[in-house]
């Protein structure tokens, strides 16, 4: 298994994609909304992906809830992370967050999808890229909600990915469109934004981490996703993280500062990433596959899901039905709440 995660164009594989998935550097595939028409088609696409690759790939998606939910029709409408604590008492918020983690994971694993890149551990709602994807503006409250969501995911059999290390919540720029700079003192980042990562790592609740395409100017001139300081010195050595480190999508403008696609990929691997994401640019992905030196990343097998969910059986279960009803209601209440605030 190799260290590259890429994407495919549509609802089913084409001939070129079948060949690309056999490349020894490919170890994963991420799905997007454009790959989804309905649940039956999605299940068949994942089957095609499994059949095309020589080794079992890690199949991933961003199914967080709120505005980031790639699969909607036929799946539970998942609430935005901010909604749990914002409009519920503490006990209800904790219960709903845990059920959301369980239900999201169960619905994805019923499609034979290994991981959803969740939860978001960024603090606060000012960032254009984050907003309601953050659980809370208070680090301890965010950690409590995230821990509940994680326990739900783990109980279903899905591994967790905390993002975006060491914290994307304070920058207003969107790293999908430009390279954000966080100019705050390093001490503030370490004692405010990074605390949630530190505590969840200590509790052994994070199986993987995705760093931010953000330059923390008081620490390093490179984005965290390509920074040996953040990934090796801080994340591995100081925090003792032993799980998988993903790059964020190297096609994002925030990664362009690291050079060509192949240079971005090599820089991220050299900095300490275990798996690099190259999405939404077939030419860029092929360039990475053509130019990266051969490398094995067998540790990625730890991310395979361990759930045994049949979609029909899951949706007939009382737990799913109760969770589906409660989470759909929370999503609707959150919409109404935002309207009263003029958002």
From Swiss-Prot:
Organism of origin is Yersinia pseudotuberculosis serotype IB (strain PB1/+)
Q: Where in the cell is it found?
A: Cytoplasm
Identify which residues the record assigns to the active site. 176 (proton donor/acceptor), 248 (nucleophile)
Q: Does the keyword Cell cycle apply?
A: yes
Point out the signal peptide segment: none
Record pathway? Cell wall biogenesis; peptidoglycan recycling
**Enzyme class, first EC level, given as a word:** hydrolase
Q: What is this protein called?
A: Beta-hexosaminidase
Database matches in PROSITE patterns: GLYCOSYL_HYDROL_F3
Q: Which InterPro entries match?
A: Beta_hexosaminidase_bac, Glyco_hydro_3_AS, Glyco_hydro_3_N, Glyco_hydro_3_N_sf, Glycoside_hydrolase_SF, NagZ_Beta-hexosaminidase
Similarity field = Belongs to the glycosyl hydrolase 3 family. NagZ subfamily.
The feature of type site (Important for catalytic activity) is located at: 174
Keywords of this protein's UniProt record, alphabetized?
A: Cell cycle, Cell division, Cell shape, Cell wall biogenesis/degradation, Cytoplasm, Glycosidase, Hydrolase, Peptidoglycan synthesis
Query: What role is this protein assigned?
Result: Plays a role in peptidoglycan recycling by cleaving the terminal beta-1,4-linked N-acetylglucosamine (GlcNAc) from peptide-linked peptidoglycan fragments, giving rise to free GlcNAc, anhydro-N-acetylmuramic acid and anhydro-N-acetylmuramic acid-linked peptides.
Tell me which EC number(s) this protein carries.
Answer: 3.2.1.52
Which reaction is the catalytic activity of this chain? Answer: Hydrolysis of terminal non-reducing N-acetyl-D-hexosamine residues in N-acetyl-beta-D-hexosaminides
Any one Gene Ontology MF annotation carried by this entry is:
beta-N-acetylhexosaminidase activity
Where substrate binds, per the record, is at 62, 70, 133, 163-164
* Xref: Pfam families: Glyco_hydro_3
Annotated Gene Ontology cellular component terms: cytoplasm
Fetch the Gene3D superfamilies from UniProt: Glycoside hydrolase, family 3, N-terminal domain
Which SUPFAM superfamilies does the entry mention?
(Trans)glycosidases
Any one Gene Ontology BP term: regulation of cell shape
């Amino acid at each position: 298994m190799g260290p590259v995660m890429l994407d495919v164009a549509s609802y089913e594989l084409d001939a070129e994609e079948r060949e690309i998935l056999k490349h020894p550097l490919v170890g994963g595939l991420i799905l997007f909304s454009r790959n989804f028409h309905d649940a039956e088609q999605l299940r068949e696409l994942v089957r095609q992906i499994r059949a095309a690759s020589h080794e079992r790939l890690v199949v991933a998606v961003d199914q967080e809830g709120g505005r980031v939910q790639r699969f909607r029709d036929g799946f539970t409408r998942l609430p935005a992370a901010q909604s749990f604590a914002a409009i519920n008492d503490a006990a209800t918020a904790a219960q709903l967050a845990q059920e959301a983690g369980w239900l999201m994971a169960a619905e994805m694993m019923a499609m034979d999808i290994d991981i959803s890149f969740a939860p978001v551990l960024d603090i606060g709602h000012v960032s254009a890229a984050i907003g309601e994807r953050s659980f809370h503006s208070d680090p301890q409250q965010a950690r409590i909600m995230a821990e509940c969501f994680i326990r739900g995911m783990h109980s279903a059999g899905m591994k967790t990915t905390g993002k975006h290390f060491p914290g994307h919540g304070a920058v207003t720029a969107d790293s999908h469109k430009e390279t954000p700079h966080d100019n705050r003192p390093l001490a503030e980042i370490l004692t405010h934004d990074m605390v949630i990562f530190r505590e969840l790592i200590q509790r052994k609740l994070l199986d993987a981490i995705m760093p931010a395409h953000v330059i923390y100017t008081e620490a390093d001139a490179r984005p965290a996703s390509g920074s040996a300081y953040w990934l090796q010195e801080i994340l591995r050595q100081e925090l003792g993280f032993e799980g998988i480190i993903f790059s964020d999508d190297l096609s994002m403008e925030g990664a362009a500062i690291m050079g060509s696609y192949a240079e971005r990929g090599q820089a991220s691997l050299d900095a300490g990433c275990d798996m690099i994401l190259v999405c939404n640019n077939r030419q860029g992905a092929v360039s990475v596959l053509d130019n990266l030196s051969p490398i094995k990343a067998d540790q990625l097998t730890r991310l395979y899901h361990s759930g045994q969910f049949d979609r029909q059986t899951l949706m007939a279960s009382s737990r799913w039905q109760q969770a589906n009803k409660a989470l759909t209601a929370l999503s609707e209440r959150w919409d109404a709440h935002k309207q009263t605030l003029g958002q």
